[in-house]
From Swiss-Prot:
Function: Putative oxidoreductase. Acts as a tumor suppressor and plays a role in apoptosis. May function synergistically with p53/TP53 to control genotoxic stress-induced cell death. Plays a role in TGFB1 signaling and TGFB1-mediated cell death. May also play a role in tumor necrosis factor (TNF)-mediated cell death. Required for normal bone development. Inhibits Wnt signaling.
Disordered: region residues: 1-24
Compartmental location: Cytoplasm; Mitochondrion; Golgi apparatus; Lysosome
Native species: Danio rerio
Motif annotated as Nuclear localization signal, chain positions: 50-55
GO MF, one example: oxidoreductase activity
Amino acids binding NADP(+): 128-134
GO cellular component, one term: Golgi apparatus
Domain WW: residue ranges: 16-49, 57-90
Listed name of the protein: WW domain-containing oxidoreductase
PROSITE patterns: WW_DOMAIN_1, WW_DOMAIN_2
GO biological process: apoptotic process; intracellular calcium ion homeostasis; Wnt signaling pathway
């Protein structure tokens, strides 16, 4: 039907097709009824199947029901600035049967996953949200009503990112808070600033990362890739876990990478080695440091889920996609060239953000965690990433490292 197409829904031939002269309508509370224009009467049962139906859920996000001067109900799509007399919920009418979750793949975009979802009751933090996948992740959440916190080191770029989102939709709720994961002091300050807002926290997306960095130590004395990709996020979750508990059900989403498969964290005796995680300059290779940090992400995610799932907090890790043209490779011209050449054959930023968004809000993942996703499908990570002993060792080491660098509270 033309109305279906106008409302952004697909029309399909089925036994539900109405005879000539009939029209499908819905009440304000979502029950479907049928109008026979020839006989000027209405009924609850479908004229062919005899079944009763109701609309599935509330109106899609951004839609509003209004009444015209003649008393007829119509529907306004505020996001796309259009109106129709067709109830968009009628494309999803059900007979009190459970609908199977839709299957996604590597071509799916984040906004496609969020289609029809209302996130206006969600508060979401995204680290590294001023560019690339992080920006598309934050943008997708905000365009579906979530209150999104852009947690970024570069405040100027973060403010521009927030302006871009709000320029796309004036009602978007986007805030910027400073977060430099290369500084544990900054991580603590961010947690204090966020807690001062008194907001809940339903989703924390640990997205920020660096790759191919020249060797340098952070102000805390750690190799920068290790601290930015893992240790800073570890402390951030530790500091916000009380807010996550109070906001439960809540989710933590950790952006890892398939590159975790090409390294290990154990020494020749099978023990976790800090010199591998945070190596001295003479032993440093930037790509290997990145791979190890991504393996840390997976081990951290699984151990976090084991500890926090009894409190209503679930955690999953994911691979967003390979060789996408983001700013993560900006420190090495050779990688920039390689990524530029691969760009026509790789995912878009929207597609790269899809698995993050899926792990953050998919209804079928409610209460489920400790998993690794690629292209919105669960897959098995490397054997070492599945090692509970290694996950526990990394947790205990990370806990000790951040405690040793803790800043004593100031006396006011």
């Amino acid at each position: 039907m033309a109305a279906l197409k106008y409302a952004g829904m697909e029309d399909t031939d089925s036994e539900d097709e109405l005879p000539p002269g009939w029209e499908e309508r819905s009440t304000k509370d979502g029950w479907v009824y049928y109008a026979n224009h020839e006989e000027m009467k209405t009924q609850w049962e479908h004229p062919k199947t005899g079944k009763k139906k109701r609309c599935a859920g509330a109106l899609p996000y951004g839609w509003e029901q209004e009444t015209d001067d003649k008393g007829q109900i119509f529907y306004v799509d505020h996001i796309n600035k259009r109106k129709t007399y067709f109830d968009p919920r009628q494309a999803f009418t059900v007979e009190d049967m459970q609908v199977k979750p839709k299957r996604y793949d590597g071509n799916t975009g984040a906004l496609e996953i969020l289609h029809g979802q209302d996130l206006s009751d969600k508060v979401i933090i995204v680290t590294g949200a001023n560019s690339g996948i992080g920006f598309e992740t934050a943008r997708s959440f905000a365009l579906h009503g979530a209150h999104v916190i852009l947690a970024c080191r570069n405040q100027s770029r973060a403010s521009k990112a927030a302006s871009l989102i709000m320029g796309e939709w004036s009602k978007a709720r986007v805030e910027v808070l400073p977060l430099d994961l290369a500084s544990l002091r900054s991580v603590r300050q961010f947690a204090e600033l966020f807690k001062a807002t008194k907001l809940p926290l339903h989703v924390l997306v640990c997205n920020a990362a660096v790759c191919s960095q020249p060797w340098r130590l952070t102000e805390d004395g750690f190799e920068s890739t290790f601290q930015i990709c893992h240790l800073g996020h570890f402390l951030l979750v530790q500091l916000l876990q009380d807010v996550l508990r109070l906001s439960a059900p809540a989710r933590v989403v950790v952006v890892s990478s398939e590159s975790h498969r090409f390294t290990d964290l154990l020494d020749s005796c099978g023990n976790l080695d800090l010199d591998l995680l945070s190596p001295p300059q003479k032993n440093y290779w930037s790509l290997l440091a990145y791979n190890r940090a991504k393996l840390c992400n997976l081990l951290f995610s699984s151990e976090l889920h084991r500890r926090m799932s009894p409190h209503g907090i679930c955690c999953n890790a994911l691979h967003p996609g390979s060789m996408m043209f983001t700013s993560i490779h900006r420190s090495w011209w050779l990688l920039t060239l390689l990524f530029s050449l691969a760009r026509p054959f790789t995912k878009s930023m929207q597609q790269g953000a899809a698995t993050t968004v899926y792990c953050a809000v998919a209804p079928e993942l409610e209460g489920i965690g400790g998993m690794y996703f690629n292209n919105c499908f669960r897959c098995l990570p490397s054997p070492q990433a599945q090692d509970p002993a290694a996950a526990l060792s990394l947790w205990e080491l990370s806990e000790r490292l951040v405690q040793e660098r803790s800043t004593p509270p100031q006396v006011l």
